[in-house]
Amino acid sequence: MAQQSPYSAAMAEQRHQEWLRFVDLLKNAYQNDLHLPLLNLMLTPDEREALGTRVRIVEELLRGEMSQRELKNELGAGIATITRGSNSLKAAPVELRQWLEEVLLKDH
């Protein structure tokens, strides 16, 4: 098995640090009630739509009333996107999953 080159590891670390910087920026934007303008600046309309679809995928997977194929037809998302969402949800920490259930399913 080939090892990752130090350059690749360094690039991965840089990307991770950039992600954490964005998360900190978003946290600060929430504290200053600037989160919507920031997200509108940083995300294209397609990216915002994709995030909304992913929230719906997670919500419906948590609800457990539809098959992945039904979700695909209902949401117009690709089956691979739904499968990734399902796998990510299975791998998510228990605390996150419980929180998502409370937040996303509270009115349903």
From Swiss-Prot:
GO biological process, one term: negative regulation of DNA-templated transcription
A molecular-function term among this protein's GO annotations: sequence-specific DNA binding
Keyword Cell division: no
Signal peptide residues on this chain, from the entry's feature table: none
Compartment(s) of residence: Cytoplasm
Pfam families documented for this protein: Trp_repressor
Assigned keywords, A-Z: Cytoplasm, DNA-binding, Repressor, Transcription, Transcription regulation
DNA-binding region per Swiss-Prot/TrEMBL record: 68-91
GO cellular component terms given for this protein: cytoplasm
Family: Belongs to the TrpR family.
Subunit structure, as described in the record: Homodimer.
Role noted for this protein: This protein is an aporepressor. When complexed with L-tryptophan it binds the operator region of the trp operon (5'-ACTAGT-'3') and prevents the initiation of transcription. The complex also regulates trp repressor biosynthesis by binding to its regulatory region.
Entry protein name: Trp operon repressor
Gene: trpR
